[in-house]
Amino acid sequence: LSFVNERTSIGDAFYGLSILLGGPFSSGSAAYIVTNLGDMIFYATPLIMTGVSVAIAYKTGLFNIGAAGQFLMGMTGSLLVALNINTTGNPGLGVLVWILAVLVGAVCGMLWGMIPGFFRAVFNVNEVIVCIMTNWIAANIVSWVFGLMPHLINSGSGKSGYLITTAVTGNGTPTLGLNQLFKGSYIDAGIIVAIILAVGIHVMLTKTTFGYELRACGANRYGAKYAGMSDKRNIILSMAIAGGLAAIGGALYYLNPGIEFKFDSAYQKLPDYGFNGIPAALLGSNNPIAVIFVALFIRYLNTGGGNLTSAGFNKYIADVIIALIIYFAGFSKLFKDIMSRRKARAAVQTATANSTMAEKAKVTESVVPDAPPKEEKQAPVSEKSGKEGDE
């Protein structure tokens, strides 16, 4: 990295921090602020989905590092539907095709997520290893599938390697008027879908029997099995749901008419959203509701970080600050865990000491005999009167 002609003084540091914390509001004119706000919300949508995907798996005691592959599978399934059915000029039919595309993408992601879940449940293979393998398998499937469909590749000037967008086929994500509220941005109804799904997952985890079983399995798999719960079923279903959520994130992102997918027939990269969902889930303590706000916060900082470059700062500063926030959040959780363990240990020691003292008291009472009862002295009886006290 080159730091030539970049701001390096302390005053510049505070200036850069103000730009970063200003987020979309540090972009200057009101029109740019509105556009940046809309884009911030749009780019937070897939991050919410991958974050909730990681969170629900973690609740079941699993680490879903395969969200990137599930994201790609959801994108692939949805684009195969949306780009092969042309509904231009028929918006009503276009909405139906869009719904179908999202559902197909979700099913693809669920099936892909079930693979590491199945190996974990049946063969006790660590899901991290299987997820890493399925990530790259998914990337190769993308290259293979779209390589068989050259008619989906954009042949326009300067667009080499990109797929056509849903703007060509008329099956883009509905905007529901949000594009008028945030003019010039990519925002669409995907954010509403993401929020509804995140809230639904939270309700499912906290208010339903199935959610309780997932959390019980995550707390103690074998204890849940002893209690009569199907640990294997819960593990497979948890990873299937996680895969479906990450896949919907990929579908919502690439079904937007303004987003192009960079297709590489030789080496398909893994999307950053699949991995960025991990810190989003960790910062939100794996709470689906909290993940919504964390994703928006991360995108808020990224938007501010994008304005740093034009002000003469290094563009990676925002990533460094977000990484520091994640580390401090992790340390705070570690500190809380340590303190809770100390309190639990102290409570056990206190209870043990009280129990020992009570047992000693019982032993003392059983060893020391009871004192004999005192005999009452009776007054002498007079021989003459037969009355007590007369002599």
Q: What residue spans do the PLM features occupy?
A:
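Transmembrane helix-bundle core of multi-pass membrane transporters
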Residues: 19, 135-207
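Alpha-helical transmembrane segments of multi-pass membrane proteins, especially transporters
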Residues: 39, 43, 66-75, 97, ...
